[in-house]
């Protein structure tokens, strides 16, 4: 039984196959690959983009979607994770997409399920489909020529599952990664590090990936105000100037904190393209896992 818990669960050949499939799905036409199949989504953390994206992907493949309301589920009444897994499995879904505030929950569920489990984000640990769609966006923009491209990841890197998954995946595809964050947002890493964003860093980047400040994962106040943070790390036109690059963000964007209003409307900012690509990538992932499991 295969699952997608981290980006390491797919090798490079499989990822390129996913990209080829996802490219076909960008036409947004409905398919019947998963007709008669049932996909359950259970998100223990709030989500708009990821949940909607997975559900759109499932429906475009012809699958039925069962969204479990966590606020009314038995887990909110004290049911153990193992009992939750057993009950989910008894419903015989063809796949489960799960998000949880605690790292490791999707892996625990996967050990007790008889269907593929897809990690929709767990704590600070991983968000594999986000990293896949980010690389897919980069891959398409540079027409497959991604090796050696310089990417600057800016923001709350230490607390970001998006950063963790991207660092693993982009390293495997030989992108040149630089991290920019204040000291308390910087993980222990061998990668190049800077503690303030400046023009020279941007001038030497092909891609900038801005990240949201994960205030819900902070144990204490680390900035007097987000405006103080923005002074050093907001992506602004005055910094980017006319540099030929692309700007990514996993969403939701804190405007004028992560990225300025002016840059959000700039043609180099591909946030909405990431959203479109995300549905296609998740279609490819669901199709692969479900059909391989039944094959």
Swiss-Prot record:
The protein's enzyme class: transferase
Molecular function, one GO term: aspartate carbamoyltransferase activity
InterPro entries named in the record: Asp/Orn_carbamoyltranf_P-bd (IPR006132), Asp/Orn_carbamoylTrfase (IPR006130), Asp/Orn_carbamoylTrfase_sf (IPR036901), Asp_carbamoyltransf (IPR002082), Asp_carbamoyltransf_Asp/Orn-bd (IPR006131)
Catalytic activity of the protein: carbamoyl phosphate + L-aspartate = N-carbamoyl-L-aspartate + phosphate + H(+)
PROSITE patterns linked to this entry: CARBAMOYLTRANSFERASE
Binding residue positions for L-aspartate: 77, 161, 212
Protein known as: Aspartate carbamoyltransferase catalytic subunit
Protein encoded by which gene: pyrB
């Amino acid at each position: 039984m295969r699952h997608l818990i981290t980006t390491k669960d797919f090798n490079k050949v499989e990822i390129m196959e996913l990209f080829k499939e996802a490219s076909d799905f960008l036409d947004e036409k409905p398919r019947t690959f998963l007709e008669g199949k049932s996909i359950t989504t259970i998100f223990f953390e709030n989500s708009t983009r990821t949940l909607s994206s997975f559900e759109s992907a499932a429906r475009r493949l012809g699958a039925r979607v069962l969204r479990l309301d966590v606020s009314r589920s038995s887990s909110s009444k004290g049911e153990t994770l193992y009992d939750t897994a057993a009950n989910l499995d008894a419903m015989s879904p063809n796949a489960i997409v799960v998000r949880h505030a605690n790292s490791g929950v999707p892996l625990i569920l996967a050990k007790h399920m008889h269907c593929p489990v897809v990690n929709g984000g767990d704590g600070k640990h991983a968000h594999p489909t986000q990293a896949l769609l980010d690389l897919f966006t980069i891959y398409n923009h540079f027409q497959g020529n991604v090796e050696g491209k310089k990417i600057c990841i800016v923001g709350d890197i230490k607390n970001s599952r998006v950063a963790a998954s991207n660092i693993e995946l982009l390293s495997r595809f030989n992108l040149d990664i630089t991290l920019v964050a204040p000291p308390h947002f910087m993980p222990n890493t061998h990668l190049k590090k800077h503690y303030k964003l400046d023009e020279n860093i941007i001038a030497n980047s092909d891609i900038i990936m801005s990240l949201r400040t994960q205030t819900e994962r902070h144990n204490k106040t680390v900035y007097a105000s987000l405006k103080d943070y923005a002074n050093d790390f907001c992506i602004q036109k005055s910094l980017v100037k006319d540099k030929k690059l692309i700007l990514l963000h996993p969403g939701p964007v804190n405007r004028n904190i992560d990225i300025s209003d002016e840059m959000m409307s700039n043609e180099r900012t591909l946030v909405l393209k990431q959203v479109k690509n995300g549905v296609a990538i998740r279609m490819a992932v669901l199709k692969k896992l479900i059909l391989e499991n039944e094959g």
